[in-house]
Amino acid sequence: MSLAAKITVLGAGSYGTALAICLARNGHKTLLWGRDDNHVAAMEQDRENNKYLADCPFPENLALEADLEKAVQASDNLLVVVPSHAFADMLKQIKPMLTENAKIAWATKGLDPQTGDLLQNVARTVLGDRVSLAVLSGPTFAKEMASGLPTAISLSSEDDEFVAELSDLLHCEKRFRVYSNKDFIGVQLGGAVKNVIAIAAGIADGIGFGANARTALITRGLAEMTRLGLALNAEPATFMGMAGLGDLVLTCTDNQSRNRRFGLALGQGKEVEQAITDIGQVVEGYRNTKEVYMLAQRHDVEMPIVEQVYQVLYRGKDAKLAAADLLSRDKKFE
C-alpha cells in the first residue's frame, strides 16, 4: 500500500510545527496533525501557524490533518510532539490506529507526570515491544529551526535502522545537523532536567543576581543532571553533548525559553499561576520539576537546585528565600 506521507508529526504547537517545516523543507512529504479543527483549518488557509509560530510559511509538501486516525495511518514514521502530560494518552489513542510497520519517535521533553518515569517506559507499557522507539532532544528553539537557522540535535534509539532513517529525514548539511547517540536514557533525561534548571536561572536573573549566579546555576545544574543520569545508568558523556550541556545553556540564557521566562516572572515577584497565564503556552518545566523531584527522591539522588525550585512551585516558598537557602548550604568539594 502506498502511504500518503513519509512522516507524520503529531502535535501542531510551535515545536511540532517547526519540525514539520524542517522535514518538508528537506523534500519529504510531511503531514502535520493538530487536535483543534479550527486551528488546522486556519493553518490550511494561511499556510502557516499564526497561533504558535507566526511568519514561518509552510512548504508546499507540508499537508495538514485534523483527523487523528487518518494522520496516523498516512505514514509508518510518526513523530510525537505533545506536552509530556499528554504523552501517554496520545500513545493510547493511536495504538489501535498504527500501521503494520509503524515506528514512533518523540520530541517531547519531560517525564511521566504520575510516576516520574522516562517516556520510553511509558511507551513500552502502552505499546509493548513491537514498535521501534526513538527520541529527539537538544538545543532547538522552534522559531530558529523553522526559519532555517543552523541547528544541531541529538537522536537516540535502541533500533539502529530507525536512527539512520530518521537522521536521513532530518539532516540538512546547510542548516540542520543530527548527532546520533546510543544513550537512550541520557538523551531523554537531559531534556527534562534542563527545564527545571532554566526556571532556577530565570528566578536568579529575575531577582537581579547577575551573570555570575546564572553561570553557577548552569554548572551545578549540569552536576545534578549527571548525578541523576548515573543513578539511571546513563552515560556521563551524554550530558556534555547536545541533549545535556547544549540544551541546558540554551534554555538558561535566552528569553525564547518559556521556562526561563517563567522563572524570571517568579523572581520578579509574580505568583506561579499568573506567570504561567502570562506566558500563554505550556511551560513544560512546571510539571517537569515535580517529575524530576520524584525521580531524584526515588533514587536517593541529591539535587538541591531541583529541590528549591520544587519548593517554590509546589510548596509556596518565596523565591528569594529559596535562593538564599541554596547559597547558604554547607561548604563542599566541587
Swiss-Prot record:
Family as reported in the entry's similarity comment: Belongs to the NAD-dependent glycerol-3-phosphate dehydrogenase family.
GO cellular component: cytosol
Biological pathway: Membrane lipid metabolism; glycerophospholipid metabolism
Protein task: Catalyzes the reduction of the glycolytic intermediate dihydroxyacetone phosphate (DHAP) to sn-glycerol 3-phosphate (G3P), the key precursor for phospholipid synthesis.
Catalytic activity annotation: sn-glycerol 3-phosphate + NAD(+) = dihydroxyacetone phosphate + NADH + H(+); sn-glycerol 3-phosphate + NADP(+) = dihydroxyacetone phosphate + NADPH + H(+)
The protein's enzyme class: oxidoreductase
Enzyme Commission code: 1.1.1.94
Active site (UniProt): 194 (proton acceptor)
Coarse class of the protein's main subcellular location: cytoplasm
Signal peptide: none
Record-linked Gene3D superfamilies: N-(1-d-carboxylethyl)-l-norvaline Dehydrogenase, domain 2, NAD(P)-binding Rossmann-like Domain
Binding site for NADPH: 14-15, 35, 109, 142, 258, 282, 284
Designated name of the protein: Glycerol-3-phosphate dehydrogenase [NAD(P)+]
MF GO annotations: glycerol-3-phosphate dehydrogenase [NAD(P)+] activity; NAD binding
UniProt keyword annotations, A-Z: Cytoplasm, Lipid biosynthesis, Lipid metabolism, NAD, NADP, Nucleotide-binding, Oxidoreductase, Phospholipid biosynthesis, Phospholipid metabolism
